[in-house]
Swiss-Prot record:
FMN-dependent alpha-hydroxy acid dehydrogenase; part of the gene cluster that mediates the biosynthesis of quinolactacin A2 (QUL A2), a fungal alkaloid that features a quinolone-gamma-lactam hybrid, which is a potential pharmacophore for the treatment of cancer and Alzheimer's disease. The quinolone-gamma-lactam hybrid scaffold is synthesized from the combination of L-isoleucine (L-Ile) and the nonproteinogenic amino acid L-kynurenine, followed by quinolone cyclization, oxidative decarboxylation, and lactam formation. A 2-oxocarboxylate binds at residues 48, 154, 189, 292. Keywords: Flavoprotein, FMN, Oxidoreductase. It is an enzyme of class 1 (oxidoreductase). It comes from Penicillium citrinum. CDD domains: LMO_FMN. It comes from the Eukaryota. The active site is at 289 (proton acceptor). Its cofactor is FMN. This is FMN-dependent alpha-hydroxy acid dehydrogenase qulF. Gene3D superfamilies: Aldolase class I (3.20.20.70). PROSITE patterns: FMN_HYDROXY_ACID_DH_1, FMN_HYDROXY_ACID_DH_2. One of its GO terms (molecular function) is FMN binding. Belongs to the FMN-dependent alpha-hydroxy acid dehydrogenase family.
Amino acid sequence: MPPVNFGSYQTKIYHDGTNLNRLPAITTNPTLLEKHAREVLSSRAYSYIAGGAGEKSTMEANRLAFRQWKLVPRVMRPMDDQSISVNLFGQEYKSPLIVGPVGVQGLFHRDKETGVAQVCSELDVPYTLSTASSSSIEDVAAANQAGHRWFQLYWVHDEEILLSLLKRAKENGFTVLVVSLDTWTLGWRPTDLDQGYFPFYAGIGNDVGFSDPVFRAKHEKKGGKIEDDIIGAANAWVSELDDRPHTWEQVEFLRKHWQGPIVLKGIQHADDARRALETGCEGLVVSNHGGRQVDGAIGSLDALPDIVDAVGDKMTVMFDSGVRTGADVIKALCLGAKAVLVGRPVIYGLAIGGKEGAKSVIECLLADLWQGMGLAGMRTVADCNRDCMRRISYPGDLKTML
């Protein structure tokens, strides 16, 4: 796969602005994305995407963890054949960046999941569809066309419905199954609680379930048609996902019925990583759900080194939670992640400018990653290692949030 110069996006912005008086559609400044999104979203929608568990201390820890790791640039290194491509599960990708699963994208813009999946295909960036989506599996696959797509599973309790979801995902070209382990029940989220708002109870974000033939048949057998009672159907679907944790032993059921890589998402402790390795799954994501589940927890980046040491190269370790910039991606790679999932920034872009806004955010992240690696003397992802960083705290690092 020939390398892609993602830094050319920076050149394009300067050229368009200088010669054509054409400025970027949305800001390139990651510190302003949330502010601009808040200006266009309803209070309920903004609270849902920007909120976290409790007093948001885990969200803050995610950002503070990044600030406490500093890159140590190297100079005078050849960069003629710079590449940020990676190989994950035998598949070559042009970069280590993956758009992670975020639910109810229709809450933020009418372009929703299908729009983001489309631009991911255009950029050749993997798109991860959430079970909690406002678009169906089939519609997202059609929008993503020949793109790389992964399916994130919220583990439904009814095995017949679960098998139907897996079948639909596989038949529609989703190649990697990402299983969320940390959301079997909701974290305590005051920003949503104060507004008494949970979009799924309003029928928003249930499209994967509502479009499932097995769920529909079971619901109708109980005497109700989904379209005649959206609220009742919403309650039935949510009950399939909530309040009953699964066990490590049950992972075998997924392995039996999914032909492809399985990634366990939500690992924060090295012992859980070792247990994940024992299941035979191919990968894991070091993630605390962006600080939305457990308040008072460690920053996800702080969990990464121990987990990488625990499983070594026996599993593909990936990372999310708190990623805002290209430098953040580099730091996660240096600490051992093979790929990095990003969520909130893409959704802020979607809110501000629809699918083109989401595309701009992804392009900015890729360009920032490319430029940052090159300037730090990292020709390829293989050059990203712990020797490239130092852990140092400065007083200004107490400013944690982007």
